[in-house]
Amino acid sequence: MIKEYYGAETFILNKDFAYILVIGTTDVSLIPGLTIAGATPELTHFTPAADAEYVLLGKCKSINTIPVSPTGIPTPALLTRASLSFINPLKIVVNAGSRIVPKIPYIDLQGEPGKDIRKQALSMEKVNNIIENSIKLGEELSNEYELIMIGESIPAGTTTAMATLLALGYDAMDKVSSASPDNPKELKRKVVEEALRNLPTDPLQRLAKVSDPVLLGVAGTSLGFKGKILLAGGTQMTAAAAIINEFDKNKLKDITIGTTKWIVEDKFADMLSLAKQVGVKVLASMLDLSISAYEGIRAYEKGYVKEGVGAGGSAIMALVKGVSNNTLVRKIDELYGELVGSSNLHI
């Protein structure tokens, strides 16, 4: 089942599409307690590369196993790979600025890893590189596709998303989600408030100060693409949509955010109000993982992880193509079972 918000319609998704995964890192993820998108703060810099490797290969090369939270909850890349296995679209990994680059073929936007937003996230040179090169990528994809789905992987990305939305004038404080069921709102607020001090007046310079390479790469690819776009992600994609709207006020009519029920139902965030402020449509997958055989998968129903790597959008695409909830969960369990059998993953 798929829920539609703000005029979103699933019929636009009945097309062949390409899956674009934009990866990057921000040093904000090194702040203790801010994100659980990795077993330790230091390992969060390996998460995007490992996510990309797993989606494409079914195994990771940059680390020994798939990224997990400190309590062993698996990366949403597992859900993405399971969903896309029923469709088999073209998959492209785009490096917007990852500290660890994946050991697979990828497109490089000539960006840089994001630094601590409390000081300066990105240089203007790299901001321009990311935007210009991703626009060109979107233009090239337009030659082959009428629809693309863009996912993201960047630990601490909800914090940089909140800073980005606030810097662009939206009411976003405390409204973004977290990979943890215990959203570290006070810490996020403290980091973001410090980042927003002495902001420059120019919007692009504001983004260089407080944003991250992935948001810019997602926005640029969308700006260059001529067809319909499914931004596969949660509150981070509302920030990407806000950047898109800053550059082109007419573009959002072609854009829908595709996410999970765990994002739209998150009591500690308000993704739908952010989407409404920005003016972007939303679809949410009602995928139910409570029937999974594995505790690590069922944990998603308790508010862990929630979204990432295009998990919600990928589930939506599978459901649109007629894959049932039970069939999709069985596939997720099958893939997770293979990983558990070959590693020391928690179950």
Swiss-Prot record:
InterPro entries: Nict_dMeBzImd_PRibTrfase (IPR003200), Nict_dMeBzImd_PRibTrfase_arc (IPR002805), Nict_dMeBzImd_PRibTrfase_sf (IPR036087). It holds the Pfam family DBI_PRT. GO terms for molecular function: nicotinate-nucleotide-dimethylbenzimidazole phosphoribosyltransferase activity. It comes from the Archaea. Belongs to the UPF0284 family. HAMAP family: UPF0284 (MF_01086). This is UPF0284 protein M1627_0030.
